[in-house]
Amino acid sequence: MTFYNHKAIEPKWQAFWADNHTFKTGTDASKPKFYALDMFPYPSGAGLHVGHPEGYTATDILSRFKRAQGYNVLHPMGWDAFGLPAEQYAMDTGNDPAEFTAENIANFKRQINALGFSYDWDREINTTDPSYYKWTQWIFTKLYEKGLAYEAEVPVNWVEELGTAIANEEVLPDGTSERGGYPVVRKPMRQWMLKITAYAERLLADLEEVDWPESIKDMQRNWIGKSTGANVTFKVKDTDKDFTVFTTRPDTLFGATYAVLAPEHALVDSITTAEQAAAVAEYKRQASLKSDLARTDLAKEKTGVWTGAYAINPVNGKEMPIWIADYVLASYGTGAIMAVPAHDERDWAFAKQFNLEIIPVLEGGNVDEAAYTEDGIHINSGFLDGLDKACAITKMVAWLEETGVGHEKVSYRLRDWLFSRQRYWGEPIPIIHWEDGTSTAVPEQDLPLVLPVTKDIRPSGTGESPLANLTDWLEVTREDGVKGRRETNTMPQWAGSSWYYLRYIDPHNDEQLADKDLLKQWLPVDIYIGGAEHAVLHLLYARFWHKVLYDLGVVPTKEPFQKLFNQGMILGTSYRDHRGALVATDKVDKRDGSFFHMETGEELEQAPAKMSKSLKNVVNPDDVVEQYGADTLRVYEMFMGPLDASIAWSEEGLEGARKFLDRVYRLITTKEIVAENSGALDKAYHETVKAVTEQIEGMKFNTAIAQLMIFVNAANKEDELYVAYAKGFVQLLAPFAPHLGEELWQILTASGQSISYVAWPTHDDSKLVENDVEIVVQIKGKVKAKLVVAKDLSREELEKVALAHDKIQAEIAGKEVAKVIVVPNKLVNIVVK
């Protein structure tokens, strides 16, 4: 039987594309543009897994489709190659992280090319290349000049095992680090911060301008966390000190019965009484060992210590004890809260635990039993009594402003971005600290500030990066003789990925980040595909940097990515025991369609789970390509289900995709291809062109492939295949299975040219209309025959044809036809006596 020999055909076409630079980005200014971007990978030692190609195949289908539609297409690939894993590996093995990274990139590139993706490799970038990070550093110097990069002594998330501080976003809900799962403790350190908060309102508002999944927009909105309320100033009794509280409910001020400061609040030590000093100091020590997420966990037991001091409630003059508690964060709001236990669950639980006063100020509920968190008419609230929420807030804010103890305020949950890492393998921060106490950015002509090569990359142990050990690199002298010391912190991995999509546009430019006219031509990115796990971090950081560059006049658009799409996860085959525990696949025995634990004999339930080394269910694309071919992998991953769904990997599904491609190969290579159109496939072909075109545009790749299958089935029923329909079908197939598409195109045309730029087929609406219809002929309501007749045949003609049919003639022989009921295009019912 004829079949598609992927081992011969796929390498042949990959070599053809490389030799001919088939996918070089188009530069014809008269053509429309299409910029298709993948989230570039971190080149790990493990190489690609089958989850990577899902998103890459989707952008590749769109890129091939748009090229055929006459677009200039920019479809690049590169490497997000700085980061902790390479450094950790280097420390464990003694190898240079640069060498390790280069080897991994070579392996990734080999795997990617084996899958037939149409990348323009002339635009390949690598975040660890000095010619690339020169511009990462340049952006940092611009942030510094604008006051958006600054140094601060801040409590950081310190991970001893990693020897570095990490951002809030990199701490998991259980209080461990995203990288490695290590304990995270709070520790005050000198750090570089980026003032992303200055862009909070724009980052929020401009989400309305992009075509992104609403779920991702909501995650960003929640992270930015805008809230409107008031700042209220509380004086500390018997002192000249005060503190400010931000509250979204200033109308409940009459119900504030105590105040809580974050343990790190600057006021704590100075207001704590001698009797409470030891307890406060011990509580502060314990709080420093917890992450922000662990501290704010709603389910955890409430803890706190009284400082011995009192605040004065400005609205009624009452004394309020001042406590410290770890659920209040110094980094959020003002680091202090007014507690209204009658109407806040956390404050109520705290008040109950420590026997603090609870005063209801809203009608409804029983505050002895639980906090009342609904709206209600104000009570026990002096001049606010009888008012609803909105009126009471307005009146209280006016009172606060009149009396000078508060004012209206918009607050954000978003914090400034902790930007420095105490590690070696990252971009050096281009700042010099001089002995006269000043700091300056490295001038543009001296960039890049190259990361020095060293064998000693272990953390210094002092909280500084390993760069602090390299005296020759570290120490500098100015022309006027003033000595200085280079910044030893490096940038986080997020730096290089915050702007890489811009460098693809002009990757070899030594004079500027990218040419302005080219940026104007290509921005914004038309489609950006990647995992939803980057919803907050990477996407928010990239939007921030883009807006800064927009303000500097570097980029012409407010937003970087016009359309975002998150592909689903490809899950691995896995098994669970009766407790729900996952069992590694090499411990499972399959017998008679059931699954059993090899060691215990227990019958297991098959349950898809995320692919992992520990479960031994990771599928390597190299193995799939070897056995089935790259086109099979591509078609299978696109046919599994909707692109955004998480679906389990299936060997049977892979075999089904392969059988389909073999059927396509046989159809084109063994069917008689003819120059005359019989018309038999008109409707099937034009329906397929219309459907596949629309479904690619809508990224419904699974239904597009289903439509291709429908056409193959229809074509196989005919004795011959019209050559124009054969060519058109191969063009529709080519974005999904490009190697087979090229091979079949040569069989049909012998052109020696790639199919890539052949104009995309179009459909003819008139061919979508059925010219014939099937008519049911009944006698006394029972079906006796079915006829195929011309559509819209008249009642008289339909009656004549029905009565003349052989079967009907036999049924009515010798009987009198009393009546004939005709429903055009549907049925003829004959009534006989």
Swiss-Prot record:
**Major subcellular location class:** cytoplasm
| UniProt keyword list | Aminoacyl-tRNA synthetase, ATP-binding, Cytoplasm, Ligase, Nucleotide-binding, Protein biosynthesis
Molecular function terms in GO for this entry?
A: aminoacyl-tRNA deacylase activity; ATP binding; leucine-tRNA ligase activity
Tell me if ATP-binding is a UniProt keyword of this record.
yes
What is its subcellular localisation? Cytoplasm
Q: Does the keyword Cell inner membrane apply?
A: no
Record-linked Pfam families? Anticodon_1, tRNA-synt_1, tRNA-synt_1_2, tRNA-synt_1g
The residues the record assigns to binding ATP are K613
Source species, domain of life? Bacteria
Span of the annotated motif 'KMSKS' region: 610-614
Matching InterPro entries, A to Z?
aa-tRNA-synth_I_CS, aa-tRNA-synth_Ia, Leu-tRNA-ligase, Leu_tRNA-synth_edit, M/V/L/I-tRNA-synth_anticd-bd, Methionyl/Leucyl_tRNA_Synth, Rossmann-like_a/b/a_fold, tRNAsynth_Ia_anticodon-bd
Give the matching CDD domains. Anticodon_Ia_Leu_BEm, LeuRS_core
Question: Which PANTHER family does the UniProt record give?
Answer: LEUCINE--TRNA LIGASE, MITOCHONDRIAL, LEUCYL-TRNA SYNTHETASE
Q: HAMAP family this protein is in?
A: Leu_tRNA_synth_B
* Protein's name in the database: Leucine--tRNA ligase
What would be the name of the gene that encodes this protein? leuS
